[in-house]
UniProtKB/Swiss-Prot annotation:
Residues 1-2, 65-71, 127-137, 242-294, 355-359, 416-425 are cytoplasmic. One of its GO terms (biological process) is riboflavin transport. One of its GO terms (cellular component) is plasma membrane. It catalyses: riboflavin(in) = riboflavin(out). PANTHER family: SOLUTE CARRIER FAMILY 52, SOLUTE CARRIER FAMILY 52, RIBOFLAVIN TRANSPORTER, MEMBER 3. Residues 268-288 have a biased composition (Basic and acidic residues). This is Solute carrier family 52, riboflavin transporter, member 3. Pfam families: SLC52_ribofla_tr. Disulfide bonds: none annotated. It is a multi-pass membrane protein. The gene is SLC52A3.
Length: 467
């Protein structure tokens, strides 16, 4: 029975971010298909953070009107909306509309908002629900949350999304064009574009390389249908989890009974040590000393949670195309997918190698931040980053993204475990810190990418960088 509950909890955790993680790993294909192009990741980052209105509303209601929200009903609503939105994505992802004189993926962006609303709200609804379960199920939940990145990444690897080839293109100077001149640019899933010309009176003026996107093994329609299936599995898992509260309530009652027994014994033990007044006086000073330390302890944890999530959910995702795509589509594809796989593997590792030491977690956060700084530096140097055109540069950027995600994922998991042992409300505020950090990261990066345009893009095949 315990194994079944672990399986249900893992599947339930998978639904927390599977939809948005699915969008991120599909980006190598989507940036070639949608009119936003290289700017698409920064658009997604801002839209995802705008969806923080969901967790903000839930947090405020919990604080000012505790008990007014049915926890189970909210989770069911979140999972239902996520399943429906993923299904609509499969059929509307490439629908574009004219806005302000140019084409934009309005349907894609609107559905992204609803998916983000689901996933962001899960941070302040799923974790409080997990407080009903024994502590050891929380690690299983984080493993499932990590699988929300692993499974879409595996599907994206099988899809082979966003891969390109370089082809020679001959430029021609036309003097007289025959009526038979045609240019075929229709290519579902980024298939290679071809130029077929039957020209009269033309002369070649030059040859250069251009990128041509190879067709994926299966379309985004299939990919998004698989995402909707994963969300449906999460919905079903939660249905069975919330229908078995009696076992957990019984275990809580047993725990409370044992605490009552211990409390009834402790005064008797105190009588042997001296008068109650003296023992009470002796205990007061340590409590006064530890209160500020306890506050500083929690403050450090919440600040670290916000900082780590600002990097992983707001700052670095906005510039992943710029830091990776200059090294080629393969480097971008592997960085997006393998870094998504690093998160669940790190969560799984934390089961066997847990370390709750805050100094250790602080050092690990600094290490992960250093890898993030390298990724950001390569994005700033785009389209000619360090070792561009050399296989060593491709390896470095992929490894850097994997280690960046892995280090900070471990920090996030262990901070969540620490707060789970503290109290139920601590997990709620942990979710709020997650979303606040993510929001700040996105708000900082969007104007840098889309307004000031500090990052430059280029065609990989025609790119010429000085040695």
């Amino acid at each position: 029975m315990a194994f079944l509950i672990h399986l249900l909890v893992c599947t339930f955790g998978m639904g927390s971010w599977v939809a948005i993680n699915g969008l991120w790993v599909e980006l190598p294909l989507l940036v070639t298909e949608l009119p936003e192009g290289w700017y698409l990741p920064s658009y997604l980052t801002v839209i995802i953070q705008l969806a923080n209105v969901g967790p903000l509303l839930v947090t405020l209601l919990h604080h000012f009107r505790p008990g007014c929200l049915s926890e189970v009903a909210v989770v069911f609503t979140v999972l239902g909306v996520g399943t429906i939105a993923c299904t609509l994505f499969a059929f509307l992802w490439n629908v574009t509309s004219w806005v302000l004189g140019s084409r934009h993926s309005i349907a894609f962006l609107v559905l992204t908002f609803f998916l983000a609303l689901v996933d962001c709200t899960s941070s302040v609804t799923f974790l409080p629900f997990m407080s009903r379960l024994p502590t050891y199920y929380l690690t299983t939940f984080f493993v499932g949350e990590g699988l929300s990145g692993l499974l879409p990444a595996l599907v994206a690897l099988a899809q082979g999304s966003g891969l390109t080839t370089c082809v020679n293109v001959t430029e021609i100077s036309a003097t007289t064009l025959s009526p038979e001149t045609t240019r075929n640019m229709d290519s579902p899933q980024g298939a290679s574009s071809t130029l077929v010309s039957k020209l009269a009176g033309t002369a070649p003026s030059g040859i250069h390389l251009e990128s041509r996107y190879l067709p994926a093994n299966f379309s985004p329609l299939v990919f998004f249908l698989l995402l909707s299936f994963m969300m449906a599995c999460c919905f079903i898992s939660f249905f069975f989890l919330q229908r078995q509260p009696k076992r957990w309530e019984a275990s809580i009652e047993d725990l409370l009974t044992s605490q009552v027994t211990l409390n009834s014994i402790r005064p008797q033990e105190g009588k042997d040590l001296g008068p109650p007044e003296e023992s009470g006086k002796a205990q007061d000073p340590p409590e006064e000393k530890t209160a500020p330390q306890h506050l500083a302890h929690l403050t450090f944890i919440y600040v670290l949670v916000a900082f780590v999530n600002a990097l992983t959910n707001g700052v670095l995702p906005s510039v992943q195309t710029y830091s990776c795509l200059s090294y080629g589509p393969v480097a971008y594809h592997l960085s997006a997918t393998l870094s998504s796989m690093a998160s669940p593997l790190t969560c799984f590792l934390s089961i066997f190698l847990p370390n709750r030491s805050l100094p250790f977690l602080g050092v690990l956060a600094v290490l992960g931040t250093s890898f993030g700084a390298y990724n950001m530096a390569m994005a700033v140097m785009s389209p000619c980053p360090f070792m561009q055109g050399h296989w060593g540069g491709e390896v470095l950027i992929v490894v850097s993204w994997v280690l960046f995600t892995g280090c900070l994922s471990y920090v996030k998991v262990m901070l969540g475990v620490i707060l789970r042992d503290h109290s139920r409300s601590a997990l709620l505020w942990c979710g709020a810190a997650v979303q606040l950090g993510s929001l700040l990261g996105a708000v900082v990066m969007f104007p840098l990418v889309n307004v000031l345009r500090l990052f430059s893009s280029a065609d990989f095949c025609s790119l010429q960088c000085s040695a």
